[in-house]
Amino acid sequence: MTNIRKSHPLMKIVNNAFIDLPAPSNISSWWNFGSLLGICLILQILTGLFLAMHYTSDTMTAFASVTHICRDVNYGWIIRYMHANGASMFFICLYMHVGRGLYYGSYTFLETWNIGVILLFTVMATAFMGYVLPWGQMSFWGATVITNLLSAIPYIGTNLVEWIWGGFSVDKATLTRFFAFHFILPFIIAALAMIHLLFLHETGSNNPTGISSDADKIPFHPYYTIKDILGALLLILALMMLVLFAPDLLGDPDNYTPANPLSTPPHIKPEWYFLFAYAILRSIPNKLGGVMALVLSILILILMPLLHTSKQRSMMFRPLSQCMFWILVANLLTLTWIGGQPVEHPYIIIGQLASIMYFLLILVLMPTASMIENNLLKW
């Protein structure tokens, strides 16, 4: 008799994805982030669900309802901070996951990579709308500034912004619809993640060498299930350290002031995980140009398979490309720092140089480094 795990229609799917899946024998801890992102998503949906039970999406009561959750609801404070800091952990895992894909050439799995880029955009949209919900000063002004960027679109811009606002400014209608979207999007993300996994399992995982691992596979369970559990424990440890010891470390103090349309905060800035893109947006003195650079800074990931000029897939044996990759990482950290600084000298010029460097590295320097390596190896 066949094992139910292999014959039952539902169990069979789980079995083929998480138990009997043939996996490369040499995938490193950089391959842990996929499962960690899944855990982050489940955690965010669960904490978000419990927050939604007590939250009210009305401009008059939104801020007070969040305060009520923290003060009066049993363990409401920990649920709220797990949700807020869970978003930070989510983005740390996301950026590590994307970085791994860039370093090891995983973007050659076209469908998986493109779904991944769509997922990245969706998660960013969800996080942005979630940040608006507590209706603090930074929530309100962040929503105003970012939605206003759409007015840079020629001809339809202004109408589009007012349509998104549901009025002539960010108000009740905006908050209500943002709450609705923020609630529904994680489920869309979960569906997209399943498609992401479906496409990945068509090809099998990449590995650090970038060479086909068909000749050397091991079952996912127990080898990678235990490895994923270790990763999950470390993730939860890091998250709970943040939540219990420094819950407001990554937040903005301005968001503890209720939203006031009549008073603009001195420095409007998004959460830390958007600062690199915000720095690129601010570095261009033209509104439409800035918006285009902002979108392209993420959309450029779609071009990665086209920009791959090396004869090797992974950067494991390519020192020059490794050098370029880590310069790109340093550049992104510089942009993140600049995004949180005021718009004044010398930050403006540093931001502009870092923005130029970002696009130059991806579009010119990295493909050139790959070609030089090909020539050095006489390929």
From Swiss-Prot:
Asked if the record carries the keyword Coiled coil, the reply is: no
What GO cellular component entries does it have? mitochondrial inner membrane; respiratory chain complex III
User: Any binding details for the cofactor?
Assistant: Binds 2 heme b groups non-covalently.
> Which controlled-vocabulary keywords does the entry list?
Electron transport, Heme, Iron, Membrane, Metal-binding, Mitochondrion, Mitochondrion inner membrane, Respiratory chain, Transmembrane, Transmembrane helix, Transport, Ubiquinone
UniProt GO MF annotations: metal ion binding; ubiquinol-cytochrome-c reductase activity
Could you confirm whether the keyword RNA-binding appears in this record? no
TM annotation in the entry: 33-53, 77-98, 113-133, 178-198, 226-246, 288-308, 320-340, 347-367
Q: How does the entry describe its membrane topology?
A: Multi-pass membrane protein
Extract the signal peptide range.
none
Q: Which Pfam families match?
A: Cytochrom_B_C (PF00032), Cytochrome_B (PF00033)
Which residues does heme b b562 bind?
Answer: 83, 182
List this protein's GO terms for biological process: mitochondrial electron transport, ubiquinol to cytochrome c
Q: What InterPro entries does the database record attribute to this sequence?
A: Cyt_b/b6_C, Cyt_b/b6_C_sf, Cyt_b/b6_N, Cytb/b6-like_sf, Cytochrome_b, Cytochrome_b_C_euk/bac, Cytochrome_b_N_euk/bac, Di-haem_cyt_TM
What is the annotated localization of this protein?
Mitochondrion inner membrane
Q: Which residues bind a ubiquinone?
A: 201
Where heme b b566 binds, per the record, is at 97, 196
CDD domains assigned? cytochrome_b_C, Cytochrome_b_N
Instruction: Tell me its cofactors.
Output: heme b
Q: What does this protein do?
A: Component of the ubiquinol-cytochrome c reductase complex (complex III or cytochrome b-c1 complex) that is part of the mitochondrial respiratory chain. The b-c1 complex mediates electron transfer from ubiquinol to cytochrome c. Contributes to the generation of a proton gradient across the mitochondrial membrane that is then used for ATP synthesis.
Q: Which family does it belong to?
A: Belongs to the cytochrome b family.
Spell out the subunit comment: The cytochrome bc1 complex contains 11 subunits: 3 respiratory subunits (MT-CYB, CYC1 and UQCRFS1), 2 core proteins (UQCRC1 and UQCRC2) and 6 low-molecular weight proteins (UQCRH/QCR6, UQCRB/QCR7, UQCRQ/QCR8, UQCR10/QCR9, UQCR11/QCR10 and a cleavage product of UQCRFS1). This cytochrome bc1 complex then forms a dimer.
Also noted in the record is: Heme 1 (or BL or b562) is low-potential and absorbs at about 562 nm, and heme 2 (or BH or b566) is high-potential and absorbs at about 566 nm.
In its UniProt entry, what is this protein called? Cytochrome b
